Amino acid sequence: MTGASAPRPLYDDIGRGYARARVADPRIAAQIHAALGDARRVVNVGAGAGSYEPLLRTVVALDPSPLMLAQRAPDAAPAVVGIAEALPFPDGAFDAALASLTLHHWNDLAAGIAELRRVAPRIVVFTFDVGTYPWIATEYLPEMVDQVDFHFPPIDEVAAMLDATVEVVPVPNDCTDGFTGAYWGRPEAYLDPDVRAGMSGMQTLDQQLIESRMDRLAADLASGAWDERHGHLRDRDELDVGLCLLVTR
């Protein structure tokens, strides 16, 4: 399908150095790749720098941001610039469509899902449940919660649109992928601007606001207030911070 246009991609503005902060976690990757089943031909929609892209399969990657695609590894799958709402592929071109942490950036969720259905019989979506937020959002950045809730529907509605099951994706305490909820047991990491650079939810908020809230987090860590509330998290192996897989039936 053709004829759709899109504004300047978000990640053309916030994606510099993204690949350094966002290294796919192997445990999360294993769950995603298992959900793909025996699919051999896979389109990775919203692929960015290539996180969670399956190996040993024929993959085509698509992303609206040339800046993000430029950060892909030299041996990564071939990639094209495009948007989810108008995939430049024929009907049934793939065995499966994968979309990882990208749905909340789409301009038209229903159109994007229709396109996934058009090009592949099996769909695997790695996303998050807006009903479950990590403490960094609820306690320090409620503006992030408001922003996501405004743009993204509840997970049961998205699952119904896909006719998909929902699988919880637990996040390890030592998760290598620096998304917003990854440091639930390592709060000091949020104080590092280089770590925050890989978190789209933070990069789309006013940076003076972010700095002031991180100053408050630093003060809570120094005083012991954070550990009084959440210190038990430091010893946990994994936690449900709202991430999930949607897998078509």
Where are the regions a protein language model picked out?
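Conserved class I S-adenosyl-L-methionine
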Residues: M1-V43, S51, P66-Q71, R122-D156, D177-F179, L191
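A conserved beta-strand element that flanks and buttresses the S-adenosyl-L-methionine
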Residues: L98
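Conserved Class I S-adenosyl-L-methionine
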Residues: V166-R249
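Class I SAM-dependent methyltransferase SAM/SAH-binding core
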Residues: R41-L87
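A short glycine-rich, Lys/Arg-flanked "PGG" loop and its adjoining helix->strand segment in the class I
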Residues: A110-I123
